Amino acid sequence: MPITVVAAIIQDQAGNYLCCKRGDWKASPNKWEFPGGKPEAGEALESALVREIKEELSAEITVLRQFDRSITGEIDLVCFVCELTGPKPTTSTDHSELRWVPEAELSKLDWAEPDLPALKRILIPFC
């Protein structure tokens, strides 16, 4: 049975996307992903995402809507469009680097496999 993971698709006012590079101590080291994590038992997906972003990035978000859900290997990744409600994050407990990336440059990053379906939906709308 796949492990459910939630992720936040966050854009800044210039339209750049928040991308996070996995630390070399994590599975899929040095791959890029949208920030998020695993829900706790009985926790709503949206609540889990708010909690994970606060824990990992010390940032506050509002979850707006589900964007994509796909199962890749052992991961059931549920991506939500989110909005920052405070300052932009600058550090992460789970990532070695944070970067605000323009849409045109997203495909240049080396992405973790579970994030690829959501990335494709961003780059090729209506697919």
Which stretches of residues belong to each language-model region?
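Conserved Nudix-box catalytic region and its N-terminal flanking loop in Nudix hydrolases
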Residues: 16-51, 55
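Short, charged/polar surface micro-motifs in flexible loops or helix N-caps
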Residues: 11-16, 25, 40, 73, ...
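Conserved positions in beta-strands of structured domains
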Residues: 11, 64-68
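Short secondary-structure junctions
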Residues: 56-62
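Conserved N-terminal beta-strand and adjoining loop/helix that marks the start
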Residues: 1-17
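Active-site-adjacent beta-strand/loop module that shapes the phosphate/pyrophosphate-binding cleft
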Residues: 60, 68-90, 99-103, 122
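Nudix hydrolase/Nudix homology domain
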Residues: 91-127
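A short beta-loop-beta micro-motif enriched in histidine and acidic residues
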Residues: 5, 27, 73, 94-95, ...
